Amino acid sequence: MDGYKPILRSLKSTDIEEFIGISRYISTTKGVGGIIKSRVEDFMIWEVLQSGEDSVRVFESNLFRGGYGEQLLCVMKKVKLDSIRAVSLIAKTLKIKSVNIGLCGIKDKASISWQYVTIPANFSGFPQPFKINNFIEVKPFKYVPYKVSPRMLWKNVFKIKIRSPKYNDIELINETIRELSSKGVPNYYGHQRFGITRPITSIVGKLIIKDRLEEAVSAFLSEYSILESSRSREVRRMIAECWNLKWAIESMPKSLVYEVKMMRSLIEDPEDYVKCLRVLPLRLRRLIVESVASEIFNKSLSKIIEEDKFNEVEVGDLVLSVDPLGRVRRERPIMVTERNLKQISEMVKDKKMVVVLPVPGYLSPIPRSSKGEKLLAVMEEEGVTFDDFKVKALPEASTKGSLRPISIPFWSFFVESINDESINIELSLPPSAYATVFLREIMKPDNPLAYIGIGG
């Protein structure tokens, strides 16, 4: 990996949040501490469409409604499996391409989740439910004329158990919620976007967008973290030292399916790094590139909070309107001017508009405010340009960029029960908002490994 120096080997768990750009809290209260995801049933997620159709209720009703269209809308229940891998397994089972399966969003691996998927209706065997091992169960719901997408999702609902809290003080939680209601919740990209124990995605993404593909492949396979399992760490270390791919395939934990596919590709074509990266699902290739932009967004947002600009609407800011469901309308942004500053500030306060920041891509508009200046400063620090996101070697992974609210546009939070052993909560968030980011303000753990069931 000429020119690339391994980073993760010296990364401590207490440095993870700084590494992925999450370095500020908006609330000033003490955290209740505790851990989440120590058991898979402690973290449950389901989707509600804009039509109000709840994926858990649809799944449990066992009703097929018929309908018309070229797509079959189903609910997929998955257990301890990430959404990209789940879609790949469904595609393999049905002998179709993964890109033909529609998704509203990617759900956490360490969870039980119920999410909508669409599958092309033109093959035999449907509309019958089916299972894949003990991890995936798919139940058809109805035929529809469209492929499901994030635009159709209203909200994600979470039931979460916080175990071993340091404080079981409901008033402390209520005080934090009041503060979040007043100030807003920073809309960071969450820890799982990058990986907590091995935050590799943005590292590989930066190498890809700089056309350093050999190094990108090598980093994906051999960059190890002191926080991952000892077996994974040892195999990656040996790959880095010896590059014995045949041995590594035999020794690699079975869960690391993408690494095995990449190594098999390299054995067949040792210098074809484009082919090697293309064994990864398209959604994952795009996610890897977009993680660079996500990290830049996070670091910019941290600077905005640090300089006390989070709740200030400035001339030059970009804003988007919010629909009656609380969803941000995907339209051309409005730039704040001296003339409309007062009106827009009132609309932001009333949650009818929201300040947005670019998640960089090759067509990103830039706010002409201090927020835009902070974004440009972070990009310069990272050595990344907007044109970098037009990926020459993997054009299918290129990203135009998007606009993301700096605060979570709408949310609801409810404590179901609280005692010395646990705090049970229900949380609703809009698409693309992260439960761990919201819980971070409530928990404020000493160590971010608390978000994967370790420490407290």
Regions found by a protein language model. Give the residues of each.
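Non-catalytic, substrate/partner-engaging modules appended to enzymatic cores
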Residues: 1-456
